[in-house]
């Protein structure tokens, strides 16, 4: 998973359009219903239902800077994308479908590792 140590956000803050590709491709997301989803940098996405049924689609950032997805043959939707933050750690993304208001919260299945801070050397 990508490291977000340079991203300063709070829980519920919208994901800036410039960060959407990084946010969605950072790692696999696990949703509340047990489904998982991955996003590739080439625009492909794979959604796997809790029962194991996979669906392939496409994702993109539209001209208004919104996250959108397309599921063949005809389903297209755009979402308000927000960070899920616990403490000082980005742990997932919240997708709210525009127009319908349906919300899906996905948590990264692996967390970004922050570098350990070394203690200052102690002089005796």
Where are these regions (language model features)?
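Lipid interaction determinants
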Residues: 1-58, 62-124
């Amino acid at each position: 998973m990508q490291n977000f140590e340079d991203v300063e956000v709070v829980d519920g803050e919208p994901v800036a359009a410039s960060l959407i590709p990084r946010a969605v491709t950072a790692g696999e997301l696990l949703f509340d219903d047990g489904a998982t989803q991955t996003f590739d940098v080439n625009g492909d996405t794979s959604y796997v239902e809790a029962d194991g049924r996979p669906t392939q689609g496409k994702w993109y950032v539209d001209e208004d800077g919104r996250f959108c997805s397309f599921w063949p043959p005809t389903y297209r939707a755009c979402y308000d994308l927000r960070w899920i933050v616990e403490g000082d750690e980005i742990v997932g993304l919240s997708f709210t479908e525009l127009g319908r208001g349906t919300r899906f919260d996905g948590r990264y299945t692996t967390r970004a590792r922050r570098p350990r801070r070394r203690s200052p050397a102690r002089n005796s």
